Amino acid sequence: GILPWNFPFFLVARKAAPALITGNTIVVKPSQLTPENAYVFAQIVEEVGLPAGVFNLVNGRGSVIGHELAANPKVGMVSLTGSVSAGQQTMAAAAPNITKVSLELGGKAPAIVMEDADIDLAVKSIIASRVINTGQVCNCAERVYVDKAIKETFMEKLVAGMKQVKVGNPNEIADLDMGPLIEASALKSMEKKVERAIQQGARLLCGGHRIGTKGYFFEPTVLDCVTQKMDIIQEETFGPVLPVVEYSDINDAIAWANDCEYGLTSSVYTQNLDNAFKVMRSLKFGE
């Protein structure tokens, strides 16, 4: 099991449990950015009496250790959660042995807000989805398509809600909504993505900047006047940035939602079940 850094303890359990339940051993390689969680997990399974060699832990860079695991002919299956490039490299390494590969990769999840949606519920859900783990989640809402008829009200509530998100160090302050980004390069990436969106014509409604000078904290951000071909719509954004696209025809919203190289998750907000199923059947996403 090759792990990312964004859910470093949960994903150990998610990969280990199916393997162990079905009578297999497992080798876990955590991200080099968050190695201690898997180490603690290994200590726990040792303390509860799991036989030596059933749960195994190795650390190192994915390009080195991950490659060796995927290429090893003794490995029966490789499960990776990570970037698209990491998935491609894993498949290539596993190919000579025709080793089974299971991948969960990047996402650019669209949220479609229809004219009859419960606006308050949609806003609350989308904000929660975008700021959880500071937006560093492959299946959280990354782009919003909202019906023109309700856009003004939706945007007012969305911006107000994003401005109310509590950001800080969870080791120092309780009752927070959002912590820091994973590292300095992630912070720089957010700054560049927002800057690029503005250069391409987007309008910054809130956020868009680093918070303070200590830590990798970034303001919850909303971008308006966004169009389909902008980088902020097409590229995965691992941070608390929400670009919003207006639509007048639901068929356009569906087409734009599908106009993306990712296909992990999506969401639809409507109070009409027929509308929900119609849109769901047309979206080319796994969830």
State the predicted function of each range.
Residues 77, 85-227, 256:
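ALDH superfamily catalytic-core signature
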Residues 1-121, 175, 247, 275:
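Rossmann-like NAD(P) dinucleotide-binding subdomain of oxidoreductase/dehydrogenase enzymes
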Residues 20, 27, 56, 102, ...:
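Structural detector of well-ordered beta-strand residues that form the stable sheet scaffold
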Residues 75, 112, 199-200, 210, ...:
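Conserved C-terminal structural/oligomerization subdomain of aldehyde/semialdehyde dehydrogenase
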Residues 10, 120, 148, 152, ...:
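Residues in well-ordered alpha-helical elements
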Residues 82, 148, 271:
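Residues that line or immediately flank small-molecule/substrate-binding pockets and catalytic motifs
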Residues 18, 68-69, 125, 196, ...:
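Well-formed, non-transmembrane alpha-helical positions, independent of function
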